[in-house]
Amino acid sequence: MFKRWCTQQKFNNATNLSHVLMDGGVLSVPFDKLNEFHEKYIEAVKSGEKLFVVEQKSPRYNFFVDIDYKDTRSLTIEEIQDICKIICDKVKRHGGKDCLISVSPPKTVGQYTKTGVHLNWPEFVVDQPSAIALREHILVALSRAKGATDWNEIIDAAVYGDVRRKSKGSGFRMPWSHKMAKHMPCGGQGCEECEGKGKVVQVAYLPLFIYNHGPLSKLTKIDPQPNLDILKMSSIRTEQPQHITVEPPSSVIKEGSFTDAQTKDEIENDELKGLIEDFIQRNMEGQSTSVVTKLFK
């Protein structure tokens, strides 16, 4: 029903890509039709139709964060709230206001359990450099509050792209939309369990909280049922010509951020490297698969 309606509206002309359908197809929804598109989307979800929609970024877009937390257990709701409060408080200092927080039910990824969390700031418009800088500010805040975890691996960087490589990054799956993923047991080759498709449907992100940015900032629990106003909060596309400018923090938490002076004396000792790697895997939380590639003194 939803895809047929999109075709009737001639949204499938691919002239200015706005949405990708993970079950096949792309859409070009003009901004003056976005409200109608959102209304039809909610109508389809409420009717029980399974949708697979990933919204693509406009040149300037409403800021968002993608958390991919993998560990031997899933995050609790309390832990999710704690992490999101730290992130939202940091973004608030740079002009962010209310934030929509959506959560995907935990799923098994290899030997780990993945907890996915999406955060959306409506009308908090950024360009690519500012989005990347905001992520770095978030990494600093999380590392100070919860230093035992490698947040650089958890706060997805790929969604923002890379300025130097001129890559734009990915889009953002809409709330209540499912995901078509490779069926890992058969490696996507197709088997009896996945009915020969090689793919499985992964469940949707559901809105659970709103961060209220007032003087006493707090998280408010919300109804996860399909809701037009909540869907509009999650939209990343915008026509807004103005965007905020955020400079990177003075201390950036990312891999490979050492100076030339710090890396001029490399230690070539495989036995020592192995001992340090073993110590890290055994004693540092969340680092059970870490690999030591180089040592410097």
PLM features per residue range, with description:
Residues 95-105, 153, 159:
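Short beta-strand elements
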Residues 67, 89, 93, 121-123, ...:
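Ordered, helix-dominated protein-protein interaction surfaces in large eukaryotic regulatory proteins
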Residues 60-65, 98-134, 168-177:
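Histidine-centered divalent-metal-coordination microenvironment in nucleic-acid enzymes
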Residues 77-90, 131-148, 272, 276:
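Well-ordered, non-membrane alpha-helical segments in soluble/globular domains
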Residues 87-89, 136, 150-153, 162, ...:
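Long, contiguous regulatory modules within eukaryotic nuclear regulatory proteins
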Residues 1-3, 122-138, 245-284:
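Charged, compositionally biased non-catalytic regions
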Residues 1-84, 94, 157-161, 165-192, ...:
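DNA replication initiation on ssDNA origins
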